[in-house]
């Protein structure tokens, strides 16, 4: 059963202060930071690009994005949780970045700006019932040749059920249920984008779906 948006926001508000540490614990069981970095790399960003990160959380993906787009680029972080955004704001302030904008919004209701070069999301789309509409909107917002990359989870084909069940249990504080892994976002990416790619890792539980806007 999927949680309401209000419940998801409440869960992440409560988890905001220890979220980064929790992701380190996921690394211990093999869910690696490298997966997120791979998604960023697939955007093929250049200096001066405009990037939208959907579900930016505490801003963990900001450093590799800023490294690529430089100070002349623009990064927009969108998240539903005000406390997660507050943590992201602290990260931005510590780093001294002047080209980052943080927006509190339901991702399904977010209006993309014009002239976007890259759209990134890691560990978010399983919450979004209207994911097809969001991916379609992203395809329209991206400039021709702009890139989308989504890293998320799905039902694994080659991961022992014991491990899958353990991860679901560990993720309950973030509002993750078994239903989270049922969204087939890659099919929407293939519908609205060209030059699509679908990569699987961690026994098929983690995937990265990417594509280029027409």
Language model features with spans:
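Conserved class I S-adenosyl-L-methionine
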Residues: 1-44, 60-64, 87, 164-172
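C-terminal alpha-helical "lid/dimerization" subdomain adjacent to the S-adenosyl-L-methionine
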Residues: 6, 23-25, 149-203
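Glycine-centered, small-residue-biased loops immediately flanking beta-strands
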Residues: 49, 73, 146
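Class I SAM-dependent methyltransferase SAM/SAH-binding core
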Residues: 52-109
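Helix-to-beta-strand junctions that scaffold the AdoMet/dcAdoMet cofactor pocket
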Residues: 70, 128-129, 142-143
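A short acidic, Gly/Pro-enriched loop at the edge of an enzyme's catalytic core
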Residues: 108-119
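A short SAM/SAH-binding and catalytic strip from SAM-dependent methyltransferases
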Residues: 118-130
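A short glycine-rich, Lys/Arg-flanked "PGG" loop and its adjoining helix->strand segment in the class I
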Residues: 132-144
């Amino acid at each position: 059963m999927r949680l309401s948006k209000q419940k998801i926001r409440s869960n992440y508000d409560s988890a905001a202060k220890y979220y980064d540490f929790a992701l380190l614990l996921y690394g211990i069981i093999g869910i690696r930071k490298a997966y997120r970095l791979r998604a960023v790399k697939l955007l093929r960003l250049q200096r001066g690009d405009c990037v939208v990160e959907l579900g930016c959380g505490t801003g963990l993906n900001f450093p590799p994005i800023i490294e690529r787009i430089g100070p002349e680029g623009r990064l927009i972080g969108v998240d539903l949780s005000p406390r997660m955004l507050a943590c992201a704001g602290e990260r931005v302030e510590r780093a001294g970045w002047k080209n980052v904008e943080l927006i509190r919004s339901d991702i399904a209701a977010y209006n993309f700006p014009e002239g976007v070069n890259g759209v990134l999301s890691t560990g978010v789309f399983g919450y979004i019932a209207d994911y097809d509409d969001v991916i379609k909107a992203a395809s329209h917002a991206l400039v021709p040749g702009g890139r989308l990359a989504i890293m998320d989870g799905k039902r694994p084909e080659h991961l022992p059920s014991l491990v899958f069940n353990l991860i679901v249990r560990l993720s309950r504080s973030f509002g993750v249920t078994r239903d989270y892994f049922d969204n087939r976002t890659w099919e929407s990416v293939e519908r609205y984008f060209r030059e699509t790619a679908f990569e699987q890792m961690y026994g098929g539980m983690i995937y990265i779906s990417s594509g280029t806007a027409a």
